[in-house]
């Protein structure tokens, strides 16, 4: 599904309709507003996450009803703002690892999702360079433990922040949920895509359940979901 938002008011309306997060977590964010970067909860960021969850939920129900993922990995997880809304829609997920090269971001992600960290690591942050991981057989250290895991689902909403090394280590049976954008002016955007065709060529999937774009007044975000 594609979206073409002409104004930020339209983006806000979409977020209000589709982004679901408990009031208690919003309260935590407000009370700790000096901890979390405000742009992590901008209209554009929330819209992209709402779009991801909306499409993934539909695909899970309509296309993959027999699939029950146990383990997820979120690459470039930043402060973990996707985690709670994801669990709201997919409560059956046993464990999600948020991976980011920035230790401060991982610390903030665990603070934001503390109840899930304390719940047998339903969420656990990992400080690591995603391009040093082999995603079909991940090995990393977190919380004093050496973890080896092959995640069922791999989410990367930060493709513009990294090269494609990570993509080459994904196996054919791992569901990929990928986002990128065409905005070159933001700091750290080293691998943007000019259009949907370029996005498709960079991240080819053999089985594709959706591929689309969300146009906002500032930039266009691209997303695809499927298997290599």
Describe the role of every protein-language-model region.
Residues 1-67, 107-151:
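S-adenosyl-L-methionine
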Residues 79-92:
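Conserved SAM-binding loop of SAM-dependent methyltransferases across substrates and taxa
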Residues 67-79:
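Conserved class I S-adenosyl-L-methionine
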Residues 101-104:
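Conserved SAM/SAH-binding beta-strand->alpha-helix loop
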Residues 143, 148-165, 182:
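A short SAM/SAH-binding and catalytic strip from SAM-dependent methyltransferases
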Residues 163-227:
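C-terminal substrate-binding/active-site "lid" region of AdoMet-derived donor-dependent transferases
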Residues 93-99:
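Short beta-strand element of Class I
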């Amino acid at each position: 599904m594609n979206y073409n938002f002409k104004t930020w008011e339209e983006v806000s309306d979409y977020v209000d309709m589709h982004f679901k997060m408990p009031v208690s977590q919003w309260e935590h964010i407000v009370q700790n507003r000096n901890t979390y970067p405000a742009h992590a909860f901008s209209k554009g960021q929330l819209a992209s996450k709402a779009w991801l969850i909306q499409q993934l939920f539909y695909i899970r129900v309509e296309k993959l009803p027999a699939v029950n993922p146990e383990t997820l990995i979120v690459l470039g997880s930043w402060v973990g703002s996707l985690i709670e809304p994801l669990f709201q829609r997919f409560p059956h997920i046993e464990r999600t690892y948020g991976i980011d090269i920035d230790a401060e971001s991982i610390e903030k992600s665990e603070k934001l999702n503390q109840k899930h960290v304390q719940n047998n690591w339903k969420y656990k942050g990992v400080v690591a360079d995603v391009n040093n991981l082999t995603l079909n057989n991940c090995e990393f250290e977190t919380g004093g433990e050496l973890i080896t895991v092959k995640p069922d689902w791999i989410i990367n909403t930060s493709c513009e922040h990294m090269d494609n090394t990570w993509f080459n280590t994904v196996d054919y049976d791992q569901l990929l949920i990928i986002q990128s954008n065409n905005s070159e002016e933001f700091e750290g955007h080293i691998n943007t895509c000019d259009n949907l065709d370029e996005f498709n060529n960079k991240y080819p999937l053999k089985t594709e359940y959706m591929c689309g774009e969300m146009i906002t007044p500032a930039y266009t975000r691209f997303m695809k979901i499927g298997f290599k």
